[in-house]
Amino acid sequence: MLRFILTRVSLIIPTFLGITLLAFFLIRLVPGDPIETLAGERGIDPARHEQLRKEYGFDQPILVQYGIYLSRVLQGDLGKSMITQEAVLSEFSALFPATIELATCAILFALLLGLPAGIIAAIKRNSIFDHGVMGISLAGYSMPIFWWGLILILLFSVQFDLTPVSGRIDVLYYIEPITGFLLIDTLLSDEPEAFWSAVRHLILPTIVLGTVPLAVIARMTRSAMLEVLGEDYIRTAKAKGLSRFRIVALHALRNALIPVVTVIGLQIGVLFTGAILTETIFSWPGVGKWLIDAIFRRDYPVLQGGALLLGVVVMSVNLLVDLAYGLINPRIRHTR
């Protein structure tokens, strides 16, 4: 087991370097001069323009710029926003809890609906319920996030006025940030109504962001459960006269969930990717909307730092899921 853990952990270094390369070089392909973006419509004189280029290192060769960037990253310095002059790490830290809160609610939504749907669909194979789950999951997986978000806004916010359109909480409430997670902060505040306001603001973004993971988890759970139900030990349990509930709960479910754990880990990356669009649609003040704003403003340090930090988060979560998969499935840790 120790060898398995060391092997997985050793992959962090090349993966991290790959993330820094992507974050640095791909962003450099964005058209436009960032210094002119800083200047705005008024523009600046050539001397000031050259001074800013030297200050931000844009006068150096591209490889030298990357070397400077990598050395600063290793020291924990991700630079400052060219627009706000705030440290990128500070801005990320302030906004990341909002993204984590949304992503957590989305994955819980996907698990609470996807796992039971997949299990029941496998037990009732070729039934109307099974076909319904497969059809809905296919539609959910294929549906564009921005289209799905706008449809839900038009239906539940505009037509029926059941949910808010944007934001994390009504403007009537001011909640002192303690943890950064609004659901927790509202519970710690003296305004219990603020908690329900935060819940109402979470409903639509959670559904939109959790739809794709829900579809994937439901289909994968069904597939894994069908495979397990066809094993010899399941037929032996049936021959012994065990009830369907005992067979599924005590014998089939644990083994069927092993591949689902890996799928859940892979959905973390999907959640952060989908959060970029979801937060933009619902004006959710998280990392995704922050990065979209940085793209329009050509704020290179924010784009580089934000992409790098998100990559590190996804890498870390996938590492933990990989280790957890090795713990629950001994065959994996002995074959790798």
Show which residues each predicted segment covers.
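Residue-level signal for discrete positions within transmembrane alpha-helices
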Residues: 12, 95, 99, 107, ...
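Hydrophobic alpha-helical membrane-insertion segments
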Residues: 16-21, 140-161, 267
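Hydrophobic alpha-helical segments of integral membrane proteins
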Residues: 9, 48, 52, 62-78, ...
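Hydrophobic alpha-helical transmembrane segments of membrane transport/permease proteins
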Residues: 15-67, 156-194
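Alpha-helical transmembrane segments of integral membrane proteins
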Residues: 2-4, 96-129, 145, 158, ...
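An internal, D/E-rich "acidic patch" concept
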Residues: 59-115
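N-terminal signal-anchor/signal peptide hydrophobic helix marking the start
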Residues: 6-12, 16
